[in-house]
Amino acid sequence: MSENEPAQMIEGRYRIVRNIAEGGMATVYEAIDERLGRTVAIKVMHTQLAKGPHREQFVERFRREANSAASIANPHIVQVYDTGEFNGLDFLVMEYVHGVNLRHEMNAQGTFSVRETLRVVAETLDGLASAHRAGVVHRDIKPENILINDRGHVQITDFGLAKAASQATLSSTGMLLGTAAYLAPEMIENNQATAQGDLYSVGIMAWEMLTGKVPFDSDNPVTLVFKHVHEDVPSVATVCQGIDPSVAAFIAHLTARQVDARPTDGAAAAEELSQLAAKLPLEAWQYRLHAEPIGGDHTDATAAALVGNIAEQAPLTGVPAGAATFKPSVPAFLADDVASNTVDTGGAADVNPPAPPVAPTTALDSSTPADASAPHKTQIMAQSGSETQVLPQAGDAFTRALAFSDEPDVASNGTGPKKQRSKKPLIIVLVIVLVLAAIGGTAGWWWFAGPGSYWSVPKPDDVTCDANASTECSLAGADWATYESTLKALGIPYKTHKEYSDDVAEGKIISSSVNKTKAVVNSRISKRANQELTVVVSKGVRMTTIPKDILDANSANGKDPLNALKKAGFDNVKHDESKDEYSMDTPQGVALTISPDPGTTAKHNDEVTVTLSKGPMPVTMPNIVGKTQDEMQAALGELKLTANVTEQYDDKVEAGQVISASQEAGAQLKWGDSVDVVISKGPEMATIPSGLVGKQESAVTKTLEGLGFEVKTDKVLGGLFGTVRTVKSGDTDLSNGGKIRLRDANGNPTVITLTIV
C-alpha cells in the first residue's frame, strides 16, 4: 500500500517495518510501537473502500472490530490496542500473534482426537464467555478465526462482524454476514445474532475437527444455508462411530437447530464442557477418526491471526527468490505426549497422532479475495429491500500462505555489505508496489466488472439441471416461496407479478427475466445498472363462475348469454347452432339450457355447453275456410297458432263452419301468432207472430216488413174489406205464426204472401 512505505511513521508512534499481507479490505503491516517498544500489527483500510460509495459500511465494520475486541479482556481474544485515521484511512493497531490458525492445522491433520478437539473448544468457549458477558456476539466463529499461538493456546480474532447483543439484529444495510458452513439457523433466517449462534458455530467447528468435514456441505451456498435452517445437524457419532456418547451429545447440544435448545451463552457451554471432562474416561479422550490430511494451507483470510515471523512458506510472486523457509515447533497442546496413557481401542483411535506441519498465517480483513480452493466460503447475503446494496463479498476466502524474507528488513539497523543494502530495499519496494497494484486492480475489477458487479441467478433446490444438456436451466416450475427466501438470503433484488397458468401449479414460477431478457440459472443481474430479477408467479388455473341469471331472458346476461360467459372469463364455450331449438316462450338468442348449471364455479378452460333459443318456429297458414270449428282448431293448434273466433250468420255457409280467416292460406306465420276466424251460425231466422189473420193489410204488412221480410198480397174479390185471411211463405202456411229464414241462399229477403179479403 503506497500510503505506508516501510519505515514510515503513523501518528509519530508506529514505525512500519514491513507489509505482512494484503486483503480485499485492508493491508496489514508489522510495525514497532516506538512509545512502548513492542511489535504490533497495523491494519490499514484500502483507499478505494475508504473513499468509495460504501465508505460508511466499511468504516463501521472496521471500527466495530476495534470497539468489540477492545471491550473484552481475555487471553483467548486477540487484543486491539489502538485505532485512528491516517491520511484519511482508518487503521487498527492489534496484538502481534505468533502462531497458525485452526484451519491450517485442520488441513494438515485431517482429523483431531477428542482431547485435541475439546481443548480448542474449551479455550474458545472461555474467550466467548468473556465476550458474551461484555454483551458482544462474535457472529463469525470458524476455524479461520481461531488462532493457535506459539504457546499452543487459542486466541479468537476478527471481531469485524461482532455486534452488541442488544443490537444483534438486521443491520441498517440489510446485510447477512457470516460464513455459510458455520452460520446458525436464526442468523440465516432473521439475521439475528445471538450468543447461542456463536455456540452453534463452535459446535460445527468441533464436528469438523473430529470428522474432517462439516456436517452440511454443498457447492451451492444457498443449498448449504437451507440445510442449516431446515435440517438437524446429524450426530457426530454417525461418522465417528467409536466416539463417547457424552461427547456426541455435547456437540449436539451446541448445534441444536432451535436457539432455546442450546446453552444460553459461552459461560454455560464452558461449564457443561467442564462437567463432561470430569467424567470422561481416558479411552474417550484418545479417540480419533482416521482421515487423510486435506493438504495445502487453505486458511481463510477472514479469520487468520496477526501472526509473527515464526515460520516461512513458499514465497508469493514478487518475493525475492531464495528466501529461507522452515517449520516451527508444533503448538504445545498438539504436541503434548499422551503415550503414557495409551489404551488399546482396537484401532479406532489414534492416541499419538503425528505432529502436523505449521506455517504462519496473517490476519487480513474480511474482504480478502477468495482462494479458489476454499471449501467453505464466507457468504455475504442481503435481506429483502430493493434499496439494499450488497457490499463486496466479505470473508469468503481462505487465508493465503504468505512468505516473509528472513533477510534483514529495510527498516532494520543491521549491518551488511553495502552492495546488498542498496538492492534489497528497491526489490522489496517493487514487490510491494507490484503486489498491491495487482491486488488493487483485482479488487477494482472484482467490484466494477467482475463477480462483485453482479449477482448470479441461483439454482432452485427443486429444479434439476442437466449439466450435459445443451439447453439452459430455467427457473420454471420452481416453488416461489422457497426461491423467494433464497433471493432474500442472497440479497438479490427482485419484483414479481402473478399470472394465471393452465400448466404451472399455483405458487410455482412461470418465467423469469432480467431487463426484459429471459433469465436462467447463472444469468447475471447487474448491480451497476440497478437491475433486478423479474419473476412471473403462477396463480394456478383461473377459476370463474357462470352467472346465476344467465337463463333469465329479462336480465342483461340472459339476453346475450354467449357474451356474458366470455366476460365471466370462460374460454371454452361450446355452442352448436344446429342444436339450437325453437321456443314459444324464450326469445331468440336467449339460452334454453347451459351445462354446468348457473352459479357453478369452474376452471376458465372447462367446457361450457350452451343451447340457445331460435325463438318461435316459422309456420305456414293452412286453409281453414269451410272447415268445421273443430277441424280449424286442430289445424291451428298443430302449428301452435292461436284462433280468435267470432260467429256470424251466413246464408251460404252452414252453421259451425269457417266462413273466413284473417290470414290467407299460405301466409308465413310463427308459433304463437293469432288468427281471427269467423264461424258461421247458418242462415238468420225470423219468427212470424201469430194473430196476423183478421188484421188489416197495412198493419200486417208493416209488421212483416219490419222483421225484414218482403210482403206480397193476393186480394180476393179485390180485397174489399182489406183484412188478412192467410199468411204463407211459399207452400208454408204461417197464418198461425212460425219461424222461417229471413233470406234465401242468395241473400234476398224471404217473400211472405198475404191473402186479403
From Swiss-Prot:
Record-listed E.C. numbers: 2.7.11.1
Domain PASTA: start-end pairs: 466-539, 545-614, 615-681
SMART domains linked: PASTA (SM00740), S_TKc (SM00220)
Keyword Nucleotide-binding: yes
UniProt region (Disordered), positions on chain: 344-387
Lineage: superkingdom: Bacteria
Keywords: ATP-binding, Kinase, Nucleotide-binding, Repeat, Serine/threonine-protein kinase, Transferase
Pfam families named among the record's database cross-references: PASTA, Pkinase
Catalytically driven reaction(s): L-seryl-[protein] + ATP = O-phospho-L-seryl-[protein] + ADP + H(+); L-threonyl-[protein] + ATP = O-phospho-L-threonyl-[protein] + ADP + H(+)
Top-level class of the enzyme under EC nomenclature: transferase
Statement: the UniProt record of this protein carries the keyword Secreted: no
Domain Protein kinase, residue spans: 14-274
Gene Ontology molecular function: ATP binding; protein serine kinase activity; protein serine/threonine kinase activity
UniProt-annotated catalytic positions: 140 (proton acceptor)
Residues that hold ATP according to the record: 20-28, 43
SUPFAM superfamilies for the chain: Protein kinase-like (PK-like)
Family as reported in the entry's similarity comment: Belongs to the protein kinase superfamily. Ser/Thr protein kinase family.
Protein name, per record: Probable serine/threonine-protein kinase pknA2
Source species: Bifidobacterium longum (strain NCC 2705)
